[in-house]
Amino acid sequence: MAVSGLSGIESMLQQMRAVVQAAQSNGVSPAELAPQPASFAAELQRSLQRVSAAQIAATNQGKAYELGAPGVSLNDVMIDLQKSSIAFQTAVQVRNRLVAAYKEISAMSV
């Protein structure tokens, strides 16, 4: 049984090596395969989109519960509402800290 497990791992390793070799033969360098660092603005935008999506999902689930949709429990609605509330509060705190940092930097003399 252990031998079959090892042969499965070896076959997976061979497949992974083949994929890497194919990528390198197509002119793709390992540096291009590595994820690129995200900019602060892009990360902030993705975070705001996640907060918005959480709020929309919680609102939709609340409406579904109000309409009596099957499979939607009050527990799930309350948990989603709390998740969206925490996400929004976190976003507000990040905004407040960014504003405070901007004010501090703008008050510095050059």
Curated annotation (Swiss-Prot):
Entry GO CC: bacterial-type flagellum basal body
Q: What are the UniProt keywords, alphabetically?
A: Bacterial flagellum
Q: Which InterPro entries match?
A: FliE
Q: Where is the signal peptide?
A: none
* Subcellular locations according to the entry: Bacterial flagellum basal body
Its chief place of residence is: other
User: Which terms does the record give in the GO molecular function aspect?
Assistant: cytoskeletal motor activity; structural molecule activity
GO biological-process terms attached to the record:
bacterial-type flagellum-dependent cell motility
Pfam families documented for this protein: FliE
- Superkingdom in the source lineage: Bacteria
The entry sums up its family as follows:
Belongs to the FliE family.
- Please report the name of this protein according to its UniProt entry: Flagellar hook-basal body complex protein FliE
| Encoding gene (name) | fliE
